[in-house]
Amino acid sequence: MKQLMLGNAAVARGLYEAGCGVVSSYPGTPSTEITEECAKYDEIYCEWAPNEKVAMEVAFGASLAGKRSFCGMKHVGLNVAADPLFTMSYTGVNGGMVIGVADDAGMHSSQNEQDSRHYARAAKVPMLEPSDSAEALAFAKLAYELSEQFDTPVLLKMCTRVAHSQSIVDTTERAEREMIPYEKNIAKYVMMPGNAKRRHPVVEERTRKLAQWAETAPVNRVEEGADHKIGIITSSTSYQYVKEVCGDRFPVLKLGMAWPLPEGLIRDFAASVDLLTVVEELDGFIEAHCRAMGLALAGKDCLLYTSDAADEL
């Protein structure tokens, strides 16, 4: 059924349809409505935690017990939850686990303008980044598939404009899921130094496999344009700004997976245009990765680091 939904409500709907059973979050704009909307579904146990670290640990406990779980917070809350995040990257999960984090470009309700994508790279966990409500719903469901397929928590990065904008979504029924049996595995789940040393290579191999998956994943796509003098790499809200300003004039590489990035796809796209441009909010995250790959491009030398990209475009 087609419905008009806020981005945050669409995330909640995606969690519901994917069979999420436990939600533990700490409130903070622009993430709060995800948990508020989840609380409307009787099939999901929802709670507000004392802080983001506790929320993440509750969700992790539910995952270990075999339930699909979610924890939500705003960008500064991920600082509080960083301790368990980095260790959970090593342990992996049992039931799928999704971590929703909402950035606030423009600081509409926040004390800083940090970019959560750096946490995905540092913690070596995948991150999905929707650009509208339809993708918010779809990516929430996809995040669970990735989590269980690759044995990892998955970050779902929202931002103010996507979280609080409305667009059309297609809803379906909830897919009920049996709990995945817990199997005691001290070497996997108890991160004493001896165990952690053996888990680190597993994490690196997982990142390599995720990068391969990203090369052909439908969340990353090239949209052709008539004029190949300029090619634009973009993501999240910035994709909407680019399409509003440029329409179909220039080819666009729209990245729905913020980490790991599809290097082969990026190189092929760069080779197909005369001038490569990256349009993104907050830090030059994609830009820095492209430059590290040896690609020449225009990025934050043309657009500011601060605020959102709408006015600058």
Enumerate the predicted regions with their spans.
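N-terminal amphipathic/basic leader segments beginning at the initiator methionine
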Residues: 1-13
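Metallocofactor- and cofactor-centric catalytic cores in central/energy metabolism, strongly enriched
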Residues: 4-6, 21-22, 26-29, 33, ...
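Thiamine diphosphate
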Residues: 22, 28-148, 159
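Short, solvent-exposed amphipathic alpha-helical segments in soluble enzyme
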Residues: 39-41, 86-89, 114-117, 144-146, ...
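Glycine-rich beta-alpha junction loops
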Residues: 104-105, 159-163, 236-238, 283
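Conformationally flexible catalytic loops at phosphate/diphosphate-handling active centers
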Residues: 150-225
